[in-house]
Amino acid sequence: MSKKRLNEIARELGVSSKEVVAKAQELGFEVKSHASSVDEASAKRLAESFGGQKSEATKVAAKVSKPEKVDETPKVETAKVEKAKETQPVVKEEVAASAVQSASHRPQSRNFKAEREARAKEQAAKRAQNQGKGGQAKSDQDRRDNRQLGQGRSNNERNDRRDNRRDQRPEERKDNRFGDRRDNRDNRRQDNRSGRLARFEQREAAKPAGPKIDFKARAAALKAEQNAEYARTSEERFRQAQEAKKQPKKPKEIKFEEPVVESKPFVKPALVASVPEQVAETTVDTRRKKQARPDKKRDFNSDEEDGPRKQQRNRNSQNQVRNQRTSNWNNNKKNKKGKANQPAKPVTERKFHELPTEFEYTAGMTVAEIAKRIKREPAEIVKKLFLMGVMATQNQSLDGDTIELLMVDYGIEAKEKVEVDNADIERFFVEEGYLNEEEMTERPPVVTIMGHVDHGKTTLLDTLRNSRVATGEAGGITQHIGAYQIEEAGKKITFLDTPGHAAFTSMRARGASVTDLTILVVAADDGVMPQTIEAINHSKAANVPIIVAINKIDKPGANPERVIGELAEHGVISTAWGGESEFVEISAKFNQNIDELLETVLLVAEIQELKADPTVRAIGTVIEAHLDKGKGAVATLLVQQGTLNVQDPIVVGNTFGRVRAMTNDLGRRVKTAGPSTPVSITGLNETPMAGDHFAVYEDEKSARAAGEERAKRALLKQRQATQRVSLENLFDTLKAGEVKSVNVIIKADVQGSVEALASSLQKIEVEGVRVNIVHSAVGAINESDITLAEASNALVIGFNVRPTAEARSQAEADDVEVRLHSIIYKVIEEMEDAMKGMLDPEYEEKIIGEAIIRETFKVSKVGTIGGFMVVRGKVTRDSSVRVIRDGVVVFDGKLASLKRYKDDVKEVGNAQEGGLMIENYNDLKVDDTIEAYIMEEIKK
């Protein structure tokens, strides 16, 4: 059974919802509001209770729906007026018919739209009648009179009338007007919709049936005609457009807004009687919106919250929210009106820029930078790149190849800009225009003395310098490069002494790279040794001529011929045998044939034609560097080109500074150093690396910028090298986590010794252990080194340096081990022993006994106890056991307890009985075999 809501019943009966709800409650229905539902019987009963009211409401609706009769004064009728009179009854009949039809099934309400349309048609008919005999003037006069009459009315009278009408309303309507407003609005909408539908059906039925028109065919024919006309005129329009482009454009004149003056059309006088000239006003359509009159003032004194508007003071500050809302509304209205009245701004055309013929680019330029350079929009370039298959944004950097392809697409010749890297020191060594060929002068040769350990290199140099250098070296071996300069026959020769030990390979390679020729010292009694072969390879790699000095010919076992033959096997052939190397037999200890050796050196240097330009800024190589406690960073430099002066701004490796002081090989202070001159300088910020190049800059500012940039690049390179992981070294990286490492901090007197010691320690091969160099530097062991060693659990090794008093006391307090050495052999041996001791001990299994389970006992809260008898060896309390059943190991673990009778014992011997319990295992069975074993450490 269907149900109806009370509001639907109220709509059908034409009464308010409240009345229906009240009536339903009176009849005893359980309802709460107009949304409550009742069944059909209850709805019928409720409708019968409103029977009298329903018929009365229907009469009222029918009466309201009829339009008011308009008085018409007989005038001179024209054809237009007659037509309006004929159509007017039809409209009335349509409105009445629609009203009656809608009132039959729903409550009738006023159709305001139909009434407005009827009134408008009547007014139009009146105006048409008055036009013939001067009626227009009379109508205008009547309207002016009515307007003047309306102006005389005061606002107070209008307010009084509104209040009176409000008081005269019935109480029921006052109370119910807000509740029924929504229902009335819905009723009006339904009535309007039904009325429009009825009128449309009547008009359609009244139309005579004409021939059927094919609108699609007519539209297609019209479209074809328009296309044909457009095609005929397209050529003419194109020509006119081209001519318009060629003509210079005139600037648009800005038209100022003129005040709007209401037009007063001239009205012809009537022929019948002379009528005084009247000004006709413009017809105003009052159907849509009520037009505001400028002379009409409104006063809403009764509706103001703060009293009459005229009596308010400082009204803007009393209600800021309302004022803000009102001001926003007014601004919006003004803006809307202003936009319509403002003249259109002249549109400035974009200037057309010609593309450049050449474009100089650098790799990494962004799309925005390129667009700015070639005067194009970034979006245009992004589109071209997209068509080329490159997805880019305007802030994305492009590589050189992409930029060149883009310029080819634009038809521009692209050239890569060559930027000079101010931080690049190497360019001074390779630039052709850096040296002036006209200023080239002869320079002293740089000679490097190489050879195996204890073959007499330092003794030879000592003899050349007439000094005792070898006595100052620890262990009698040279452990860093010495640079010295001597004079022979009025010509200077610079000597570099390199270590012969295997740990100093990098130092020998460095010496060979800066030298002009090499003196290879070979002992006549020892012959060719491993470091001798290495020195030969370094010299050949540097393309340096070799002079062989066969030393120790005074010894009884000397055999120079054997040495010549061994060297020939390694590619060093004597000139006597048709080779290119000079051989000189000497005795450095007894000063034999030393002069002949020097003459040979000068002869080979003269053949090479060694020259340098002393006028340019100095460039060269770092031979050695160390940190002095009083002087700071001290670097031994070899000037290769130019002249080095005191106070020169200099960049050395990854550091910079100004030459504060300069001393020669004899320890004397000098102010200048020419080509091929070794000097020691101070004034650097940090200690450079041996083998770094140096260069003098124009000013300290550029030197500082270059040094900081080089330091930044070196740090970035180091970080990239440590963080880079590839598929190739991934396994090694994972495996390194299983290897034990010993952390070491190295401090030495010179940079070369630091490098040699670090390289030697990392080459120690002990399986399972590796050396990790935490920190290495030049200088004495200080407190920061001890702090770092404590934090990283490292060992501090000092090579030819001593710890400070503060560092020594801190090391004792923090229990940090510090080892001091002066011989590299002892450092390597000591580290090997320490690394071997770090290895995890290796164990092997040893079976000590075997027993058979004879009986089992299950004890609550304890577990299973196995009674056994030892059949071989013994079973100890600390041994591990295996439970073997039918030849299969079913459990492997530790003993929980071992007893003999009721006593706990440490072991049970052969052929003895006892009881045992196994940890975490209670499944012992008779005839199980118990195998006892221990793990013994394997001694290395």
UniProtKB/Swiss-Prot annotation:
Annotated spans, G4: 551-554
Region span, G2: 476-480
Domain (tr-type G) ranges: 442-609
Pfam family, one: IF-2
G1: annotated segments: 451-458
UniProt keyword list: Cytoplasm, GTP-binding, Initiation factor, Nucleotide-binding, Protein biosynthesis
Region annotated G5, chain positions: 587-589
Molecular function in Gene Ontology: GTP binding; GTPase activity; translation initiation factor activity
Basic and acidic residues bias (residue ranges): 65-95, 112-125, 155-206, 232-258, 292-301
Nucleotide-binding found in the keyword field: yes
Region of interest (G3), residue spans: 497-500
Job of this protein: One of the essential components for the initiation of protein synthesis. Protects formylmethionyl-tRNA from spontaneous hydrolysis and promotes its binding to the 30S ribosomal subunits. Also involved in the hydrolysis of GTP during the formation of the 70S ribosomal complex.
Name recorded for this polypeptide: Translation initiation factor IF-2
